[in-house]
């Protein structure tokens, strides 16, 4: 890992005895032991988990990536990691099952537990039904194949369109408009400038979430309608 002995000894010392408490309002529970996992909120925890989970990437690389070659210039995409969320990509049924087998073996060896209730498969396609061979399992349990999955707030559909994402963002943003209007009414401030500033601070971040990905998509009318609806309600 490139870390010297002093750093490793310091980390061992930090995790030799880990205790925690739970805060509920102004109250604290009694201390209890935490024999597994990383310290919550500790600055080193994200780095330590990244080093830990990187073992999975190495194993998939070793046994064959079976990923997706987006273009000749790009490297083969086979995994996305964000905190403890893992996304596996493959362009074949056998390739994905191989990745799942590696994940199962690596998780067992590292003492990780995979939540199968939150583990789904999306087959990206132009249409039609799934083939008989398009089935996958993890440690002997069948995995559910779904038409849509939300990853980091973005809805991924089988056709790789963002129409469902637009509707989801618009609905979430629309629910926030009454709160802004109520605040303006409470403080007795009906200036358009104040309304626009509140909209830009509270609603616009919701509407533009993930726009780095879908910003060039043509069908964004549902997003703009939230802005027009908010203006009409304000007036």
Question: What do the PLM-derived regions correspond to, one by one?
Answer:
Residues 1-6, 37-47, 69-74, 90-96, ...:
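Conserved, non-catalytic sequence blocks in retroelement Pol enzymes and Pol-derived host proteins
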Residues 1-6, 62-63, 109-113:
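Secondary-structure transition/capping motifs at alpha-helix termini
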Residues 11, 16, 26, 113-147:
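Short, conserved micro-motifs composed of acidic
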Residues 12, 57, 87, 97-108, ...:
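Short, well-ordered alpha-helical packing segments
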Residues 37-41, 45, 71-92, 103, ...:
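Catalytic palm active-site di-aspartate
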Residues 51-83, 87, 96:
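Active-site palm subdomain of RNA-directed nucleic acid polymerases
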Residues 83-84, 118-120, 124-126, 150-235:
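Non-catalytic, peripheral interaction segments enriched in hydrophobic/basic residues
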